[in-house]
Regions:
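Glycine-rich loop(s) and the adjacent beta-strand/alpha-helix scaffold that form part
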Residues: 36, 41, 50-121
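Conserved redox-cofactor binding core of oxidoreductases
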Residues: 1-40, 44, 221-257
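Short beta-strand or tight-loop elements
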Residues: 34-36, 47-49, 60, 263-266, ...
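FAD cofactor-binding and catalytic pocket of flavoenzymes
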Residues: 87-214, 221, 245, 253-267, ...
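Extended, folded domain segments that form the structural surfaces/walls around functional sites
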Residues: 76-82, 213, 221-228
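Generic, well-ordered alpha-helical scaffold segments in large soluble proteins
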Residues: 24, 28, 70, 82, ...
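Hydrophobic/aromatic beta-strand patches that form the interior of the parallel beta-sheet core
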Residues: 33, 68, 168-170
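Generic recognition of stable, solvent-exposed alpha-helical segments in well-folded globular domains
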Residues: 16-20, 33, 62-63, 71-78, ...
Length: 273
């Protein structure tokens, strides 16, 4: 049993990041700073000379020889913009690989938090239309990942919680044609992203296939991460095709489908063109 591997692993026998990269014989832990935010880089003659940071509310300027800026697609553009860099692509072209999920409840224990974090994978529809589509993947369902995607479940909440170990989850990971952007505000920047109808169609197609897969696997109940939550129960005698028909009619509207982001990409292009 690997436990809640989604949030790290306490077993010293595996090659975790602490063992591979941050072991005491390889890395000086005094060089890691918590409660610290990088605000900008000081640039002189085209070279970064200092990193301007805020640590516990105090501002500092740290002299550097080299800088590797690896703050992710959501934060790197703001640091570069605040450092004086200008590029028409900077902060644009945000891709998120939008994700939504389906869960199935089974009569046998699933223990969705245990074992391999991703044991199911299908790329049959990765290039569904115009070289864009989606992946189907297994989901490591820690409670903090599972319950927020189904906040409008109408069942008794205590019963829903107690049934957790019988649920199995999976996601649709969409290769998006949609694009977002970074809005550079101080002190906190914002992110803007709207899912277009093309990507919404691919997402719904993937959700439909996950519903079918759970049904064929014998699920007693199936939930779709919409708002309100769409919930099918075998005991209700609702025809599964009727339920799938309702899924197909879900419109591309704000907050109608609960979405996550698998990966954030594309906002720090270097080439000016």
């Amino acid at each position: 049993e690997s436990g809640f591997s989604t949030f790290g692993h306490s077993d010293d026998t595996i090659n975790s990041s602490y063992k591979s990269w941050f072991s005491k014989d390889k890395f000086n832990e005094d060089n890691i700073y918590s409660n610290t935010q990088v605000k900008s880089l000081a640039i002189s003659n085209g070279k970064a000379t200092h990193v301007n940071v805020e640590h516990n509310g105090q501002s500092y300027s740290v002299a550097v020889e080299k800088v590797i800026l690896a703050s992710g697609s959501l934060n790197t553009p703001k640091i570069l913009l605040n450092s004086g860099y200008k590029n028409k692509h900077l902060g644009q072209h945000l891709k998120l690989h939008p994700v939504s999920g389906v869960a199935g409840k089974f009569s046998d224990l699933q223990n969705p938090w245990a074992g391999s974090m991703q044991g199911i994978y299908s790329d049959d529809n990765l290039f569904r239309k115009d070289n864009y589509g989606y992946l189907l993947e297994g989901l490591p369902m820690h409670p903090s990942l599972f319950f927020p995607f189904f906040p409008n479940n109408q069942d008794n909440f205590a019963d829903f919680i107690s049934s957790y170990n019988y649920w199995s989850g999976s996601i649709v990971l969409t290769s998006d044609t949609s694009s977002g952007s970074i809005i550079n505000k101080n002190p906190q920047h914002l992110w803007k992203y709207n899912l277009n109808n093309f990507d919404h169609g691919n997402l719904l197609h993937g959700i439909e296939n996950l519903v079918k897969a759970n049904f064929l696997a014998g699920a007693e109940e199936i939930m779709v991460a919409t708002s309100p939550t769409m919930h099918w129960k075998r005991e209700s005698n609702e025809d599964i095709e009727s339920f799938i028909g309702k899924v197909r009619k879900v419109r591309n509207e704000p907050f109608r489908i609960l979405l996550g982001s698998a990966h954030q990409m594309g906002t720090a292009r270097i080439h000016p063109n």
